[in-house]
Amino acid sequence: CAQRVLRPSINQATIQVLQENGVEVVAVPEQACCGALNLHAGDKEGAQDLARKNLKAFRDVDYVVTNAAGCGSGMKEYPLLFLGEPEEEEAQALAAKVKDLSVLLDELGFTPPPPPRRPLRVAYHDACHLAHAQGVREAPRRLLQAAGLEVLEPREWELCCGSAGTYNLFQPEIAEALGKRKAENLKATGADLVATGNIGCLTQIQAYLDLPVLHTAELLAPLYEGKDPRA
């Protein structure tokens, strides 16, 4: 939900990359917020109300592709949200269909874009909700490498950037310290830009880093058109 306002280009780039890989993209108008922020705030009933809308909205699609790690993690936890309740089985079915963009492309057999005209060094930041909550680390790296990009690993890759859902709102001082530390580690790689898979991380890191910070989809999409992602 925040991504549509803060960085709508991520959604546009995601659609483009999926279509370049032969995926029919269907925008389901009945979908709702995933409910993750409700859960962060302790509002379980509100999260369940939103989740029920999504259980119904996504019944007839093959996959639910997410380009925000926090949302993907939240939807994959629907079975826990409905544990012991009538919706549990349907929640399990939906959770199995939820895939991060990088995972779906990696599983389908990624058709990479032409490599950049100039060498491009990319530091990859692992979003906690992708690497830790979903166990996804290698898929986005494989996509970037297949596109001819040099992927650099920062120190303390496992460290949170300080965004953490609503954590940066309620613990701003600690969040700032984490954000600056993460930015320093990414800068130290000597990269031309940073790639990540979550809008919260992207926004947080960009506040403390003087390098472009892009979503993986934003990095790949221009390459299909022969353009420089830094432009």
Regions found by a protein language model. Name each.
Residues 1-231:
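Iron-sulfur cluster-binding electron-transfer modules in prokaryotic oxidoreductases
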